[in-house]
Amino acid sequence: MPISALHGDMVVSRGDNLGWSAAWKINLYGRLGDGESAYRILRGLETEISIHPQRDDSDRVPSMEGNQGIQAFTAGIAEMLVQSHASEIELLPALPKEWPTGSARGLRARGGFTIDVVWKNGSLSSATVQAKYAGECRLRCAVPVRVLHGNREVQGRRVDANVTEFATEANAVYSITPQP
């Protein structure tokens, strides 16, 4: 059984309660690529526990140990949109169907990268990758992508159908679009 399946079983067996661990479960489901489960908990926190302005609308009081809960909550959203592990940046790894269109700016990835991402109809529309350092960027996306630096197409290497690797220059910005 793959390690992700074991972790997924552990998260599922503990349930989707909205107590102090809920914000961390958003992160765990996001890391496992399960955007629907992450969204279900996120939505529960928003509607069933009063993190919204009208505290009187809920009979449940939030239990998010100070800033820790809010940090985990926002980190979970970021985890649903961009992940960077094993020298790879993955765009929209756990996008729930409830977010068919949207954007995020300034998401950080390992290796000194800053990511902006836009999606429409549940799929990548465009992204930018800003490299702080010169080196390699390995990008994973559900659709094959094209990489531009300014108006010039960057010659990358297709590692597999969903992974493109390309060289970066320090402080350069790269535009990412789905291949036509």
Regions found by a protein language model. Give the residues of each.
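Surface-exposed beta-strand/loop patches in extracellular or lumenal glycoproteins
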Residues: 128-144
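Short, exposed beta-strand/loop patches in secreted or surface proteins that constitute
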Residues: 118, 155-158
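Active-site core of glycosidic bond-cleaving carbohydrate-active enzymes
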Residues: 1-84, 88, 125
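Residues that act as N-cap/strand-start positions at coil-to-secondary-structure junctions
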Residues: 101, 111, 123, 133, ...
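Short, well-ordered beta-strand segments enriched in hydrophobic/aromatic residues
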Residues: 115-117, 124-131
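C-terminal beta-strand-rich structural cap/linker in extracellular carbohydrate-active enzymes
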Residues: 157-180
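Catalytic cores of secreted or luminal carbohydrate-active enzymes
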Residues: 67-116, 120
